[in-house]
UniProtKB/Swiss-Prot annotation:
Keywords: Cytoplasm, Methyltransferase, rRNA processing, S-adenosyl-L-methionine, Transferase. SUPFAM superfamilies: alpha/beta knot. Belongs to the RNA methyltransferase RlmH family. One of its GO terms (cellular component) is cytoplasm. This is Ribosomal RNA large subunit methyltransferase H. The gene is rlmH. It comes from the Bacteria. Specifically methylates the pseudouridine at position 1915 (m3Psi1915) in 23S rRNA. It catalyses: pseudouridine(1915) in 23S rRNA + S-adenosyl-L-methionine = N(3)-methylpseudouridine(1915) in 23S rRNA + S-adenosyl-L-homocysteine + H(+). PANTHER family: METHYLTRANSFERASE, RIBOSOMAL RNA LARGE SUBUNIT METHYLTRANSFERASE H. The keyword Kinase does not apply. The keyword GTP-binding does not apply.
């Protein structure tokens, strides 16, 4: 199995870039991870729905064929670290070729992306910036694989 993260926008804050790079490198020990950064639509005079649609079009074009798609959304299903680990393990056992996780931009995801997703998942009931969400997601993926492998990182 491979993991693809489709992310709207770049990490512009140094400590987030460093943290994300660290967890991306750690994840590579378990399976190939690819992060695709998509152009963030400028807000200017554009309304939020227009921005979501434009970013959504770019996201939909980049979803790999045959991939199981998880879109991050504030109204998505909340999962614990253990449940995420179980989901990762299930997809590895079922030989899912690729798991694609989508992080929208500042205004979230358009309905078309949410409808395309096989699962909507929430990282937290609190609002996170899309840049912070990337770091949290990478850490949780790493934590999930350490749980699956019974490695000493996650404290039960």
């Amino acid at each position: 199995m491979k993991i693809c993260l489709l992310c709207v926008g770049r990490l512009s804050i140094g400590y987030l870039r460093e943290g994300a790079a660290d967890f991306e490198a750690r994840l590579q020990r378990y399976l190939p991870v690819r992060i695709v950064e998509l152009k963030e639509e400028k807000s200017g005079k554009n309304d939020a729905e227009y921005i979501r649609r434009q970013e959504g079009r770019r996201i939909l074009e980049k979803i790999p064929a045959g991939s199981f798609v998880i879109a991050l959304d504030e109204r998505g299903r909340s999962v614990s670290s253990e449940k995420l680990a179980a989901l990762l393990e299930r997809h590895m056992m079922e030989s899912t070729p690729e798991l694609t996780l989508i992080i929208g931009g500042a205004y979230g995801l358009c309905d078309e992306v949410k409808q395309r997703a096989d699962m909507l998942m929430s990282l937290s009931e609190m609002t996170l910036t899309h840049q912070m969400a990337r770091l949290v997601l990478l850490e949780q993926l790493y934590r999930g694989f350490t749980i699956v492998r019974n490695e000493p990182y996650h404290n039960r």
